[in-house]
């Protein structure tokens, strides 16, 4: 079995995990910028057209056929809806996209849609607003209080996130962010609604946790992994310690059954001082949390390979040890 990772970025560890899981019975390929070290760690790589280029999908299909690649796993939020729209086209060529259905990618990438989904599922997200007038009305009625968080509606990697402490900061940073979005990769998805491309949320006090919800390839709930976040870097978990997932399982099962995502779902949440679990964001892909789960004895790559090969769920691969603290090391390399 040969597997391709699109937009592999800095996730060299994912390449290594899958190489180890294949146990010599296949190769791992990657695509991204030529300046990405991860490419040098894969068994092969390609430089594809940009994701919104009309030649992107035909290029990937031809590359997969040439290299006998039978599964693609995207690692970047922008890739997800583009690939999901073409799921059937890949399937006709015998290539499995390990990606959620298109509506799921829209719910996860659009933080306003995430908020609405969580409310409908009976869960507790932070109070969230789409316009300045609605936010100011909520402030005037004491429904929310400063500090607030202003961030892109279609955001990723902590790009353009601001904490505001008063009305003056809110107005200034809202305007600044609305301008800045168009100078980043966020402009592509934000073009879906240029006037309402920012959300404003109540700042949440409490301890931040990360949970990963694993569904099988038929979108059925399989497992939950959890960790306490100790430090962050560039929007990714940098230091974390695995914790007992039991308190998070009811929420994970609710999300799984309502969302029906495929494979991994990366979820950020807080436990408030009163003990309430507040769900913040979701990403329907391998996220920056996964190395901490892997270090705690879980082997999702091996399980995915078994599923892709027609095998059953092996719960011994999905049993997380608690109390395992890990960090991500920065190690300069020549490539």
Residue ranges and their predicted role:
Residues 124-125, 167-204:
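Conserved ATP-binding module of the ATP-grasp superfamily
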Residues 125-128, 148-177, 208-210, 230-241:
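Glycine-rich phosphate-binding loop of ATP-grasp-fold ATP-dependent ligases
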Residues 1-99:
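ATP-binding N-terminal substructure of ATP-dependent carboxylate-amine bond-forming enzymes
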Residues 238-242, 287-303:
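ATP-dependent carboxylate-activation loops
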Residues 232-279, 283, 308:
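A long amphipathic alpha-helix within ATP-dependent nucleotide-binding catalytic cores
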Residues 92-160, 179-187:
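A conserved helix-loop-beta module that forms one wall/lid of the active-site cleft
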Residues 162, 172-174, 198-202, 208-228, ...:
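Beta-strand scaffold of nucleotide-dependent catalytic cores
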Residues 138, 302-335:
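Peripheral (often C-terminal) accessory segments that flank ATP-dependent C-N-forming ligase machineries
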């Amino acid at each position: 079995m040969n597997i391709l990772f699109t937009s592999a970025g800095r996730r060299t560890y994912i390449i290594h995990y899958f190489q180890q899981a294949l146990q010599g019975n296949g190769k791992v390929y990657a695509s991204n910028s030529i300046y990405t070290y991860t490419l040098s760690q894969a068994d092969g790589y390609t430089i594809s057209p940009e994701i919104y280029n009309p030649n992107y999908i035909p290029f990937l299909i031809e590359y997969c056929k040439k290299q006998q690649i039978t599964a693609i796993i995207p690692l970047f939020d922008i890739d997800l809806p583009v690939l999901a729209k073409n799921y059937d086209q890949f399937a006709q060529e015998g290539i499995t996209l390990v990606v959620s259905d298109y509506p799921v990618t829209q719910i996860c990438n659009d933080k306003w849609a995430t908020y609405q989904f969580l409310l409908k599922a009976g869960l507790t997200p932070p109070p969230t607003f789409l316009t300045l007038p609605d936010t100011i009305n909520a402030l005037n009625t004491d429904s929310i209080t400063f500090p607030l968080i202003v961030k892109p509606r279609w955001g990723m990697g902590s790009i353009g996130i601001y904490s505001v402490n008063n009305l003056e900061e809110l107005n200034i940073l809202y305007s600044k962010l609305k301008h800045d979005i168009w100078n980043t990769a966020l402009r592509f998805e934000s073009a879906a609604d240029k006037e309402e491309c920012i959300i404003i949320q109540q700042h949440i006090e409490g301890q931040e946790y990360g949970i990963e919800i694993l569904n099988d390839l038929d979108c059925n709930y399989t497992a939950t992994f959890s960790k306490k976040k100790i430090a962050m870097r560039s929007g990714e978990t940098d230091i974390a310690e695995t914790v007992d997932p039991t308190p998070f399982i009811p929420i994970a099962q609710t999300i799984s059954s309502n969302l029906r995502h495929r494979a991994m779902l990366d979820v950020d949440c807080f436990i408030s001082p009163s003990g309430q679990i507040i769900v913040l964001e979701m990403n329907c892909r391998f996220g920056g949390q996964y190395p901490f789960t892997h270090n705690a004895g879980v082997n999702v790559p091996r399980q995915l390979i078994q599923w892709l090969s027609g095998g059953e769920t092996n719960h011994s691969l999905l049993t997380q040890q608690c109390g395992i603290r890990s960090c991500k090391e920065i190690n300069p390399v020549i490539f």
